[in-house]
């Protein structure tokens, strides 16, 4: 089996990808048998290519799955932890813009009564 490209896999449906994954997973055992029985040299180096192909298929499956989950949870209030943006603990606990802008009644009254004075400098 030739080297599989990820861009070719992205257009396929999930069922096709799973079928291809099963085919690829069966291949290394056959190649190992060929290695023990003294098969051709081309088959010996093929194990590495097959392993990488399995990894590519799994990567594409996982990426499409995560992409679909992102679409599903877009605009919802609660999201799974792995879909939330990666932030430090301190950033997660920080006040948001709305909470920072809130003022107490006393502060609002003070701002209203004693606004900042603006002076014009005479040249």
UniProtKB/Swiss-Prot annotation:
Pfam families registered for this protein in UniProt: Ribosomal_L29
Transmembrane segments: none
Subcellular location: Cytoplasm
CDD domains: Ribosomal_L29_HIP (cd00427)
Record keywords: Cytoplasm, Ribonucleoprotein, Ribosomal protein
Gene Ontology annotations of biological process type: maturation of LSU-rRNA from tricistronic rRNA transcript (SSU-rRNA, 5.8S rRNA, LSU-rRNA); translation
Origin: domain of life: Eukaryota
GO CC terms, sorted: cytosolic large ribosomal subunit
Molecular-function annotations in GO: mRNA binding; structural constituent of ribosome
Family according to the record: Belongs to the universal ribosomal protein uL29 family.
Function of the protein: Component of the large ribosomal subunit. The ribosome is a large ribonucleoprotein complex responsible for the synthesis of proteins in the cell.
Subunit structure as annotated in this protein's UniProt entry: Component of the large ribosomal subunit.
HAMAP family the record matches: Ribosomal_uL29 (MF_00374)
Annotated protein name in UniProt: Large ribosomal subunit protein uL29
Organism expressing this protein natively: Platichthys flesus
